[in-house]
Amino acid sequence: MVPAKIIRRSIPSAILSVGRPLGKRGRARYNLRVFTLHPQLQTDCHPLGKLTGGRLLLHRNTAVTWFILVPETKAADLLDLPEAQLNSIMADGRALSVFLKNERNFPKVNFGAIGNLVPQLHLHIVGRTPEDACWPQPVWGNLPEGPAYTEPEIETLRNQLIEHCDLQPVD
């Protein structure tokens, strides 16, 4: 059996199940960084979990079903991502689109990466219907104040995403 101390030197604590987390110097040694969500996204959204391509958030306003997918990257623009990461996040976007259409009955899904107000790369995946609060206008800048999701509504949506999109909890 290999002692934990030896394993600890060769494997970052982010993937170890035992031992203390790596400090700042340890993360730098392994080129690891702590994921930090932009404050505006923290204010506007409920965290749901993690997909292969990044963190999944839910916009607080129930007027439309609006997901925000945030890749764990320093890149500012979608097309600046390495090909593998771009493919991963696009696959997540497609899975969310299929979920919105098939499980939530939205006839249209808007997909966008704008980033003018929030510089952290994030993608908007929004379920749309002619009956929604902004139709046919885009949701950006046109969304009226609306009620926030309740905890039971968030948990129901989270469970559906676990089943249909392989949503994972965030560590």
Residue ranges and their predicted role:
Residues 2-4, 14, 18:
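Short amphipathic, helix-prone segments within low-complexity/disordered or flexible regions
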Residues 17, 21-24, 47, 52:
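Intrinsically disordered, low-complexity segments enriched in small/polar residues
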Residues 30-171:
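HIT superfamily nucleotide-processing domains
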Residues 11, 16, 126-128:
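Alpha-helical and His/Cys-centered functional microenvironments
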Residues 8-9, 20, 25-29, 33:
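Basic polycationic patches enriched in arginine
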Residues 1-8, 42:
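Intrinsic structural disorder
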